[in-house]
UniProtKB/Swiss-Prot annotation:
Protein name stated in the entry: Homeobox-leucine zipper protein HOX15
Tissue expression from the record: Expressed in seedlings, stems, leaf blades and panicles.
GO MF term (any one): DNA-binding transcription factor activity, RNA polymerase II-specific
Signal sequence region: none
Keyword set, alphabetical order: DNA-binding, Homeobox, Nucleus, Transcription, Transcription regulation
Region (Disordered): 1-44, 223-248
Homology family: Belongs to the HD-ZIP homeobox family. Class II subfamily.
Chief location: nucleus
CDD domains the record matches: homeodomain
Originating species: Oryza sativa subsp. indica (Rice)
InterPro entries for the chain: HD, HD-ZIP_Homeobox_LZ_Class_II, Homeobox_CS, Homeodomain-like_sf, Leu_zip_homeo
Gene that this sequence comes from: HOX15
Length: 248
């Protein structure tokens, strides 16, 4: 009796398992790929002790499709933007061809005003049949050329000033060396003149010293001696031109 019950339960379990598996496969085949549906996967692991464990796995198909469409649109937009940038870059790199009248008018306006406000820019662009951006770029380039020319002129002027100052510095250095040599030779000659003995031929008589010596001798001597000294010529007093007397 117990054996019969076990056989019946086993048959029911097998029939239920096979029926669930078949229904799951049919629903999976019938579900469209573009529909947002949840797929249920049933499995009976051996370690669960005979208890069926249901693992639910959600896959949102629409979300995946939307993400794919977003990536595709993004790539398409990036390629179109890159192409537009390339076209704009090519157009911006093209040199602007101006007629003589346009160039003359731009030069006159630049002499009046080196910079333009938006209103002046638009008015000048309409007058020249150009775009405001082209007028702005022309003024920017013209200011850059003017600044470059002024910088070159200033550089040339500074170079000339530097050369002049260098030559003046050399001349002053030569003069300083000459003055130092002259001062050294003069000091050496003066030292030799004061230390060497003076020859007798270079000595001369000091008149004031001679008068003082005569008066002192007359005051201390007798009248006879004074008369004799007066009648007798006195010896000349010699002095050096480098050593002056205090009475002179």
């Amino acid at each position: 009796m117990a054996q019969d019950d076990e056989d019946v339960g086993l048959a029911l379990g097998l029939s239920l398992g096979s029926g669930g598996h078949r229904r799951q496969r049919e629903s999976r085949d019938e579900a469209p790929s573009s529909a947002a549906a949840s797929l249920l996967t049933l499995r009976l692991p051996a370690e669960s002790g005979g208890q069926p464990q249901v693992v639910v796995k959600r896959e949102v198909v629409r979300a995946e499709e939307e993400e794919y469409e977003y990536e595709y649109e993004r790539a398409l937009y990036s390629s179109s933007a890159a192409a537009a940038d390339d076209d704009e870059g090519c157009n911006s790199r093209k040199k602007l061809r101006l007629s003589k009248e346009q160039s003359a008018l731009l030069e006159d306006r630049f002499k009046e005003h080196s910079t333009l406000n938006p209103k002046q820019k638009v008015a000048l662009a309409k007058q020249l049949n150009l775009r405001p951006r082209q007028v702005e770029v022309w003024f920017q380039n013209r200011r850059a050329r003017t600044k470059l020319k002024q910088t070159e002129v200033d550089c040339e002027l500074l170079k000339r000033c530097c050369e002049t100052l260098t030559e003046e510095n050399r001349r002053l250095h030569r003069e300083l060396q000459q003055l130092r040599a002259l001062t050294h030779s003069t000091a050496a000659g003066f030292f030799m003149a004061t230390t060497l003995p003076v020859p007798a031929a270079t000595l001369s008589i000091c008149p004031s010293c001679e008068r003082l010596a005569t008066a002192a001798a007359a005051a201390g001597a007798s009248p006879t001696a004074a008369a004799d000294r007066t009648n007798k010529p006195t010896a000349p007093h010699l002095f050096s031109p480098f050593a002056k007397s205090a009475a002179c």
